[in-house]
């Protein structure tokens, strides 16, 4: 006589739709997503896209789509503000847009070169931590072209619901600081021209 309740329970579970069963799991996954996990996922995605673009043969439009996705994980506007400061704020809108786009392309191109080649194995994520200003630092290691195991410390901050890259330290050297120093040198020699700086950035790109 005890078989009937058990059978009813089994039948009730079987009648649950896949979406009904999946909903609590999806909600749990959403609830479990922390800034640290989002930042780690963003870095992992940058690495994956770099590998796919550098190592796979694909139509140009596919490569461009992946390149644009990689750029979407970089807060180029924030980096450009750090790099150029008041020069960016005082530039005409068209010049601001152009230089931010060029800087975004240049940083993404550098990440592809650093992380995408066959030399860049293994790539290891070592963990994430929040720093005092609320940004997240993600530590990773990868083999560089010269054969040594280098450290990349990624700094990401919240923008909307996402965590976007605002800097990466390569063996302790900041990409953002390097870009700022390079820009300062070029601006001092080109009369302070943002368009000339933009053209110079584009001339240094591998992926065009």
Feature names for model-found ranges:
Residues 7-16:
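Bacterial N-terminal signal peptides
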Residues 149-178:
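Short beta-strand edge/turn micro-motifs at domain boundaries
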Residues 24-111:
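Early exported N-terminus immediately downstream of N-terminal targeting peptides
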Residues 88, 105-106, 130-131, 144, ...:
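Solvent-exposed loop/turn segments at secondary-structure junctions
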Residues 1-4:
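Positively charged n-region of N-terminal signal peptides that target proteins for export
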Residues 170-208:
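Low-complexity, intrinsically disordered terminal/linker segments enriched in charged
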Residues 101, 109-150, 200, 204-208:
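Surface-exposed, charged secondary-structure patches
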Residues 17-19, 23:
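N-terminal signal peptide c-region/cleavage motif recognized by signal peptidases
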């Amino acid at each position: 006589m005890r078989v009937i309740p058990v059978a009813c329970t089994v039948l009730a579970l079987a009648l649950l739709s896949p979406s009904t069963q999946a909903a609590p799991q999806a909600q749990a996954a959403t609830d479990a997503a922390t800034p640290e996990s989002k930042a780690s996922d963003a870095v992992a995605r940058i690495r994956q896209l770099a590998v796919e673009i550098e190592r796979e043969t694909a139509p140009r439009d596919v490569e461009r789509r992946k390149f644009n996705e990689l750029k979407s994980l970089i807060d180029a506007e924030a980096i450009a503000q750090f790099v150029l400061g008041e020069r960016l704020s005082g530039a005409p809108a068209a010049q601001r847009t152009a230089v931010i786009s060029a800087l975004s392309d240049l940083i993404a191109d550098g990440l592809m070169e650093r992380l995408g080649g066959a030399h860049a194995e293994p790539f290891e994520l070592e963990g994430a931590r929040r720093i005092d200003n609320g940004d997240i630092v993600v530590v990773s290691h990868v083999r560089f072209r010269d054969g040594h195991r280098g450290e990349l410390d990624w700094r990401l901050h919240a923008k909307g619901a996402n965590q976007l890259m605002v800097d990466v330290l390569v063996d302790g050297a900041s990409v953002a600081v390097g870009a700022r120093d390079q820009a300062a040198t070029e601006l001092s020699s080109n009369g302070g021209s943002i368009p000339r700086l933009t053209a110079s950035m584009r001339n240094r790109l591998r992926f065009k």
